Amino acid sequence: MGSAQDQTKKRKRQKVSDGSKSSKSRVVEADDQRELTETTTKPKKQKTEDPPTDETPDAEDVEQTENGETAQDDAAKDAEAPLPSTMGLSLPTDAAPQKFDELNLSEPTMKAIRQMGFETMTEIQQRTIPPTLAGRDILGAAKTGSGKTLAFLIPAVEMLSALRFKPRNGTGVIIITPTRELALQIFGVAKELCEFHSQTYGIVIGGANRRAEAEKLNKGVNLLIATPGRLLDHLQNTQGFVYKNCKVLVLDEADRCLDVGFEAELRQIVKILPSEERQTLLFSATQTTKVEDLARISLKPGPLYINVDHRKEHATVDGVDQGYIICEADKRFLLLFTFLKKNLKKKIIIFFSSCNAVKYYADLLNYIDLPVLALHGKLKQQTRTQRFFEFCNATQGTLICTDVAARGLDIPAVDYIIQFDPPDEPKAYIHRVGRTARGTKGKIGRSIMLLQPSEVGFLNVLREARVPVVEFEFPQKKIIDIQSQLEKLIGQNYYLNQIQSAKDGYRAYLHAYASHSLRSVFNINKLDLVKVAKSFGFTTPPRVDITLGASMSKDKVQARRPYGSQNKSARFKRRA
């Protein structure tokens, strides 16, 4: 930064107006401003595919420009325009601001923030937004539910506005997230934040119509939210995708991206995107060796490390009562049924360990007049999206799901998290619990984990991970005993027994248990299979095969194990 006199001279030489009052103007260096204005030399056009002329852009994916022109009209006028370096931007870096209006943000952004109902920043927002506005690369560690979505979206939108991005400039911000639901969640927040800006925004995710996505990218999407696989596909194969002007790359939930197998895709994406003037923000709830390696190849040397958790006594978010109930396997479903019956007016999320268990229990609960929504990875994307937003908008109801919904999603006003099946590790527990009381002061959520007597060793694992849990009592005499009716229903109902197979759910539960990462605690040989089978509505355990293959951890050898109705001495012998 120069002296006040130098700054005055620069302002006299060049000023970039954003259409608002002159006091709100953004200042850039003179050389950069000359690049921003349209040059007399016509830039080389990038080869594109002509989108169908009869298709109108989706209002939610591609917004209109300030002058009422659509992104398609704007893109047709010219090829992508060169943009200045972000290094010339003079953005506010006031020390330790507490409220959004102390950041000197543009009026369209402030108007959107006020409309969203926010006034005071969370800690991650206080510590991240000012240095990000100043152009620093960020390596952030924050709990789920801490408010980091706005922490990276606000600077991203401000940058696009300050540089006056047009659709013809292509994509200036790319946000990568591990799951489709989280991408949709971020897209919803971006839509609200961009309401009073002229910049366009969009989303590309697996399971959606790829051709429609490509057409929107051809028209120009300034802010793009994406899942790694689909983004890499467009980077490599969509010729009209203008990404050379990408100024900001956000890697959200980076540890989760790596956990679910996107390491190779992320490395290729980072390599393809321009790096010289790119600002990168990497957020991860946990810091692992793989996350550090990804940070090394994506961030500039000397990034700002922001950790809002290290001073916290507990690893989970505040405002959540966390506890567990010791329950025999054959009482688990009866306890769940009783709990749901007594809390029909509450908003509840229940976690299971497998898709087949979710499918079975969803059909069972709906059949016995306990309405629930099911969310798991085997659903079509349109169905997943519809159910996710249906539950988000509901004031009461029950969602049963796998961990596909456990990471990063902001589901409003959840009263209870029920972990029907224990998580695979403390990290998964933390993200499940993060679905309730997300960044809201005064909101108390409750998390309840069901543990069998043989699983109490998991409590020591949680305590070592700084997760506070207490034992909740649920009197046995209050449990509604419908076991005989349940067994009769499963025995006689063809749909539940064969079509939505209780047997498939039972097999999937045993498979997940056998492949648990904490096998010293969750030992399948300690399970009482008769009691486990009763929780699925069987009078005797059905015979099922469990395949443990190479996709699991190294200490698991390939084997095929039969479980079910056989004599006790032979029950756990491997088949030759």
Swiss-Prot record:
GO terms for cellular component: nuclear envelope; nucleolus; preribosome, large subunit precursor; small-subunit processome. It catalyses: ATP + H2O = ADP + phosphate + H(+). Residues 51-66 have a biased composition (Acidic residues). It comes from the Eukaryota. One of its GO terms (molecular function) is identical protein binding. ATP binds at residues 142-149. Residues 319-490 form the Helicase C-terminal domain. The keyword RNA-binding applies. Gene3D superfamilies: P-loop containing nucleotide triphosphate hydrolases. GO terms for biological process: maturation of LSU-rRNA from tricistronic rRNA transcript (SSU-rRNA, 5.8S rRNA, LSU-rRNA); maturation of SSU-rRNA from tricistronic rRNA transcript (SSU-rRNA, 5.8S rRNA, LSU-rRNA); snoRNA release from pre-rRNA. Residues 26-37 have a biased composition (Basic and acidic residues). Residues 1-94, 555-576 are annotated as: Disordered. Keywords: ATP-binding, Helicase, Hydrolase, Nucleotide-binding, Nucleus, Ribosome biogenesis, RNA-binding, rRNA processing. It holds the Pfam family CTE_SPB4. Coiled coil: none annotated. Residues 129-305 form the Helicase ATP-binding domain. CDD domains: DEADc_DDX18, SF2_C_DEAD. A motif (Q motif) lies at residues 98-126. A motif (DEAD box) lies at residues 252-255. Its EC number is 3.6.4.13. It is found in: Nucleus, Nucleolus. Belongs to the DEAD box helicase family. DDX18/HAS1 subfamily. Associates in the nucleolus with the 60S and pre-60S ribosomal subunits. This is ATP-dependent RNA helicase has1. It comes from Aspergillus terreus (strain NIH 2624 / FGSC A1156).
